[in-house]
Amino acid sequence: MEVKASLKYARVGAQKARLVADLVRGKDVNEAVKTLTFLNKKTAGMVKKLIESAVANAEYKKVMDVDSLYVKAIWVDQGPVLKRFRPRAQGRAFGVRKKTSHINVVLEEK
């Protein structure tokens, strides 16, 4: 049986989030949380909370042993881009693209 959790509209680029997702894919849940705790990246905290949310979903359903869960799948999709303008010299303005992403995780028992 699988449990899922997702984080929508995370204010981080998909390419940067995929670097963190690749580190925990296939790992035991406890090992993944330890890895993310000491990883010095903005996305690591988001993915850690997402995995903990999926574990809480498994506890709530009461159909799985939480200690035997592992990260079966984790993927990052690109979300909508927030377009902003940054004022520049002599009345000009440059466009700034603030990227978002959707992070999904699936946990399963070993």
UniProtKB/Swiss-Prot annotation:
Pfam families: Ribosomal_L22. InterPro entries: Ribosomal_uL22 (IPR001063), Ribosomal_uL22_bac/chlpt-type (IPR005727), Ribosomal_uL22_bac/org-type (IPR047867), Ribosomal_uL22_CS (IPR018260), Ribosomal_uL22_sf (IPR036394). It comes from the Bacteria. One of its GO terms (biological process) is translation. GO terms for cellular component: cytosolic large ribosomal subunit. Keywords: Ribonucleoprotein, Ribosomal protein, RNA-binding, rRNA-binding. PANTHER family: CHLOROPLAST 50S RIBOSOMAL PROTEIN L22-RELATED, LARGE RIBOSOMAL SUBUNIT PROTEIN UL22M. Belongs to the universal ribosomal protein uL22 family. Part of the 50S ribosomal subunit. This is Large ribosomal subunit protein uL22. It comes from Bdellovibrio bacteriovorus (strain ATCC 15356 / DSM 50701 / NCIMB 9529 / HD100). The lineage of its organism: Bacteria, Pseudomonadati, Bdellovibrionota, Bdellovibrionia, Bdellovibrionales. The gene is rplV.
